[in-house]
Amino acid sequence: MSDTPSSPFIEHPETPRKALFSSNRPSPVRSTHATPSLHGTPSTASRFSRTPREDVIGLKKTISQLRYDLEALKQEQQVAQILQEEKERELEAKHKKELDRAEQAESDQVFLFNKQKELSDENRTLKEELRSLQSQHEADGRELNHELEGLKDLLNDLQSENRALVSEMNYKIEDYEHRIKAASTTTDDLLKEVENRGTALTEAKMNVVKFEQLVESLKGESLDLKQSAKDLEAVEQTKSQLSDQIKYSRELEAKVSALTVRVEAAESAQQLSQVYEEDLSSMKGKLKNMEGLRQQLAEQQLQILVHEENSAKWKAYLEKSDEFKTVEEVVTALNKARMEKASLLERAGSGVNDETRSTAEAYARLQERVTTLESELQLAQNQLKTEKKKVATSIRQHTLAANEAKFLREQLKAYDDEEVTAAGADVKQGRIDELEKLLEAVKNEKSVLEGELKEARSEQGCTVAAGTKRPRADDSVSSEVISEYTRKLQTLQQEFDEVSVEARLLAKTKEALEARLESLEKSQESRVRILELRENPTSRHEAVKQSMLDTLKAENEALMGKNENSKSVPQASLERKQLELQGVRDKLASTEKSYQRLKEVFSVKSLEFREAVYALTGYQIDILRNKKVKVTSMYAQSDEDSFTFLPDPNHKGQFAGVIDSPLTDEFSNIVDYWVKDKKDFPCFLAALNLELYERKENNGNQAS
């Protein structure tokens, strides 16, 4: 029985069986004498030394001991069986729990996969919504930019109104002049009053001196009158009179001091008025000088235009001519031709003698005829030039009038569109009348020019007809005279050839002038766009207003520079600055109001966005200083359990790591794996949420 193996499920070593079979425990049937062993044959000495009764008693004891051991073994076996069954039940429960946990983990994995898929879909939708919000914000930004442009336009309108207000400075200057005159008159009155008050003051001082003498005399008398009680009333009266006189003298001194202050103010005002008058006179002189300079500038511009036209004429002529390249060549050729002509005339004159006086007379007649023809040709060319100029001017004026009429129609249409007030009808009617008068004047000028052109053409026809008449030939000329005539005719033919050359040159100049005229007409039609008359009343009025505005600005700057040291400012400047300040305040209030509205809308939208992010991702995101981001999970035990991410300075919109905290030490394995090794912050946040969720669930199960 000692070889029976012990049960493996018995966890406590101190069992009854082990205590029973321990070698140190003495046997209950062992005596001082030797007893037979259970496993061996007793010796002969021991067997013969004991009696049968003792053997029976010993056997009984061993039997009882064995029964006791058997009962103990049975109990031990029952306890071991109970423990084994309990252990088996615990193992089955643990195995079942592990199976449940594995199934739960499997279901959790499926749930997390589905959840991650849903989160990715929601993240995608959030990104799309974020893009739509960004586009909406961009649209709002564009609308705000449009509003800002509108505000800028409003500011420009206000500035134009401010310029209009500056035009009122002229009236205020006149007001200042009247005020200066009034101030000068008031200063004169004040000076007179000061003189009167000064005389009154001297008289008052004399009276004070007299009263002081009287007081001293009365004091002496009072010493005498102290002994008599009857004169006390007289003394009191004198004292009251003295006090009244002193009060009156003090009042006079106060009035004199006030008058001195007023006199000083009047003197300063008079000085200012003198300064203003000097400035006005200097400004008027400058304005007159400016008018003279403008006239000189206009004359210089006209001279420049004339020189440009002459240079253009020479340029067009030289482009058509193949012989001449510069104006100097043309002048030298002309002088050469004149010299040749003079030499020919001298040679022709030297060949005439007394015998051929009649031939000379005929030659003279022919020469006169040639000269008349040349003069007529020159006159015709001049008339042709003047006619062309008149035609060009009439065409120009006609185009100007047509364009002006077109522009005026458009301007009238614009006036009809912009007419708002009742007074606009009268102004428009006045403008229409002025423009109609101007159009009639242009038409009359056109008709006059056409009449002059017709008269010039008729005169040219008459002169040509008169010049073509030939003198009748003399029948009494002899044959020698005829031969002489033939020689002279040859010379005249040569001269005629030369004249024909000049005529061809003139024809070339005519062609060049016509080409230049065509080019000018084309350039005039293509480049020039006439919007108004040269002497437009509106532009003239605007120029006058602009010049007045410039002078007023200069005067205002000069006056402001002179009044910098004084504490007072002009009333007009103060009112203008107050109006500008009020406009700026209104603009600032409107911008602050719009900014406050945008701020409220942005706060509401940002709160909605944060709530949506918190509901979808499980994290509350807070933006800290220096572009740090604080992230707190919804499964955290407290608000202090959060992570703070550091921004990456090299990459915009990315993070470099996590700031060390007790929570990072607690989840160091997740931080090391996802943040330090993988650099994947979304997976880190997802793993952290899962870990916190499992911890929260385990704490809830343990609490339940």
Swiss-Prot record:
Q: Does the keyword Translocase apply?
A: no
Tell me what this protein is called: Spindle assembly checkpoint component MAD1
| Coiled-coil region list | 53-603
- Bias (Polar residues) ranges: 21-49
Q: Which InterPro entries match?
A: Mad1
Residue ranges crossing the lipid bilayer per the database entry? none
Subcellular localization(s) per the UniProt record: Nucleus
Q: Where is this region: Disordered?
A: 1-53
**Functional note:** Central component of the spindle assembly checkpoint.
- Keyword set for this entry? Cell cycle, Cell division, Coiled coil, Mitosis, Nucleus
By sequence similarity, the record places it as follows: Belongs to the MAD1 family.
What domain of life does the native source organism fall in? Eukaryota
GO CC annotations, alphabetized = kinetochore; mitotic spindle; nuclear envelope
Q: Name one GO biological process term.
A: attachment of mitotic spindle microtubules to kinetochore
UniProt-listed Gene3D superfamilies: 1.20.5.170, 3.30.457.60, 6.10.250.90
